[in-house]
Amino acid sequence: MWKKRKEHLIPLEKSKKIIYLEKRGRRQEKKSVGAICFAVLAVLCLLYCLTIALFMGYGTAFFAVWGALAVVCGLVSFVLSRKRLMQKLPRVLKIMVVICFILGLLCFGVVEGLICSRFAATAQPGADYMIVLGAQWKNNGPSYVLKKRLDKALEYLQENPDTYVIVSGGQGSDEPVSEAQGMYEYLSEAGIEEERILLEDKSTSTYENLYNSSSLLDKGKDRVVLVTNNFHVYRGEKLAEKMGYMHIEGLAADSYPAMLPNNMLREFFGIIKDFWIGKL
């Protein structure tokens, strides 16, 4: 009789089943540190996105990326907080995700370090030409970042009366005049002689700013000072060097502190894109 019963017994390895008991009350299972961190990041990204949209002036819709980051961080937090779901995920997949995350952080850190390395860029006196990169021109005058560039350019031009300046930037759909025309009027009204100001009013990007401006000078011989905001100097210099400017120096203007995280993140993607397509 014992033998018959034994024949109907299910092997131990086939009968194993893990039962998770849901913890309730004060002894409820605590959230993982990773889930909490990503939840906090999601809230911060969402708040920053809304702050830019509601209270700060912005020239592009890039700030929406912070909203997308909030969604991604929220989803990651949700997954990390679900123990059963984490148990079901293949180990190989989890290892690959962790490796990609670490490599992404390293890449981000290196690029941001390069950007920060040119935050305080200064230029030697006596340049032949200066190029002021364009930015949004509003109905009531230059945007904050463009005004900072123009004021920094004005300081250098007043101290170096033999330097010519190229103001570079076309007219966007939301701009009353071309950026170059607006900058021309700003500098001339500040006392810079009109014959020293050259206009390049067709460009729509940093690359085009530099490419179109190169026809107004000699890239191989002339010393050129490139004026832009601190977060933008590194990319501007590298684009110019790749384009054949042999004597290029960045001159860093200040930027709006509250918008710096947004501008730094945008520069990161800009550098990655330009490197990918061979412009850097």
List the predicted regions and their residue ranges.
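Hydrophobic membrane-insertion alpha-helices, especially the h-region
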Residues: 96-110
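A transmembrane-helix-recognition feature enriched in membrane-embedded lipid enzymes
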Residues: 260-280
